[in-house]
């Protein structure tokens, strides 16, 4: 049985990456450096824009984060794909929180819009995931819309984020 708390610490997220939070068969978050959040501050089975579930998580920004040193030299900015990946990570985390099992894989996204950037001078990135649908069949899949904010300002939106959980990924 999954401990369905409303919030999770960095240590909890690291435990997920080791397969300890949702059990050996549950989906895992990536380990650092690809883990793109420091905490989950809210998880609910209702709520969000569609009243089908909501997740909110945060990443603390500091100039020493690994991507600022290489993207780009003299013009440091967090790659937009990392914010997108964070949203996929949270969709998979939510599926594990619901008690689903399998290996998480991003399956796609409808549309992504970037209207801002994350610079090393920022303090905090906030991710908001609004669930539209959970499919519980042979393939378990989450479908959601997401938002990325930097210091409270909306900078990315993504529609139709899709993550599936697979028992066997050898043929994927």
From Swiss-Prot:
> Which is one GO molecular function term here?
trans-2-decenoyl-acyl-carrier-protein isomerase activity
Please provide the Gene Ontology terms (biological process) for this protein: unsaturated fatty acid biosynthetic process
> Can you cite an annotated GO cellular component?
cytoplasm
Q: Which CDD domains match?
A: FabA (cd01287)
Q: Which residues form the signal peptide?
A: none
Q: Which organism is it from?
A: Escherichia coli (strain 55989 / EAEC)
Q: What pathway is this protein said to act in by its record? A: Lipid metabolism; fatty acid biosynthesis
> In the UniProt entry, which residues are flagged as the active site?
71
Q: Which HAMAP family match?
A: FabA
Q: How does it assemble?
A: Homodimer.
The protein's location, in the record's own words, is: Cytoplasm
What the protein does comes down to:
Necessary for the introduction of cis unsaturation into fatty acids. Catalyzes the dehydration of (3R)-3-hydroxydecanoyl-ACP to E-(2)-decenoyl-ACP and then its isomerization to Z-(3)-decenoyl-ACP. Can catalyze the dehydratase reaction for beta-hydroxyacyl-ACPs with saturated chain lengths up to 16:0, being most active on intermediate chain length.
Q: What is its EC number?
A: 4.2.1.59, 5.3.3.14
What's the protein name?
3-hydroxydecanoyl-[acyl-carrier-protein] dehydratase
This protein's superkingdom? Bacteria
Protein family per UniProt: Belongs to the thioester dehydratase family. FabA subfamily.
Q: Which InterPro entries match?
A: FabA, FabA_FabZ, HotDog_dom_sf
Q: What does it catalyze?
A: a (3R)-hydroxyacyl-[ACP] = a (2E)-enoyl-[ACP] + H2O; (3R)-hydroxydecanoyl-[ACP] = (2E)-decenoyl-[ACP] + H2O; (2E)-decenoyl-[ACP] = (3Z)-decenoyl-[ACP]
Record key words, sorted: Cytoplasm, Fatty acid biosynthesis, Fatty acid metabolism, Isomerase, Lipid biosynthesis, Lipid metabolism, Lyase
